[in-house]
């Protein structure tokens, strides 16, 4: 209101990410000049979705952006899903959308960008026709069927992969918690702090954030419940790996018979799909950590406790193998399949030392593989190193 006194057309845009408890009151108060950002999937047929879609009638505009879920990597092909995302916005009543695409120098053969370009000029463009023309242009008529099939399989895998909440649904959330380089140990808190420092240095957390020892929480929020984690693991295993494995084999075979530019395209796409598999497996294993460790702690039945412990051991072994595969791909591939800062890692991005950090992760997981699953329930009450207080006396309060 103060800004509108000098600029009558002033508008404030915000989102409700951290205000779920206050959402009812905030939505009731939205009016002219107070605009809301929402994710496209929120504008559904539920009571909440209908309420959001009714806001413009009160002068509160709705804004959104669209990007492919879990798309932290660069140049991941899922053109049919990309088209559906954009057309879904149009069907929801949007006449403008901010669409995120990967830069051509980093993803020169990105079919998603081709589809979005076509839709920008012709909303009724036939996606299959656009995809087929791009494939022929990239690898020739003979190689195009294999490339199109690999794109279709990858599209299927991306659709099938579940939401891993803040870790996977936001490009900025994934590097914040250093999932690629932190050890998924059964009892993270058992690892000496000095041995955890290499990745905690760039985690976006405070010294007493429970996420340091619990992948299921962040500050006072629950990122993922045990039931949600169980469902995510089951969905990933059911709907993702078969399609990615088939696409991998198809592209590997295509490379053997290709030459020149076509061969370069097939190699580029294969590297990106293998990176996607590593990325998805890390997210899947994040959910498996939550399901296994929390399940073990909560279990009362001995048989259930044993099952959850076995789940934790399987998760550790799976992530060790996956981490080794990612390090090998990073060191051998010339394809820029993920954001990397050549000047060094930061809170928002990994650096060229990624393989070195992954090897530290693997070593810690191998050392602590058989630890009993545990989460320190009082971690958030810990003192900073330089507090100058007796921890035992402090905990009495």
Task: Report residues per predicted region.
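Substrate-binding groove of N-acetylhexosamine-processing glycoside hydrolases
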Residues: 1-397
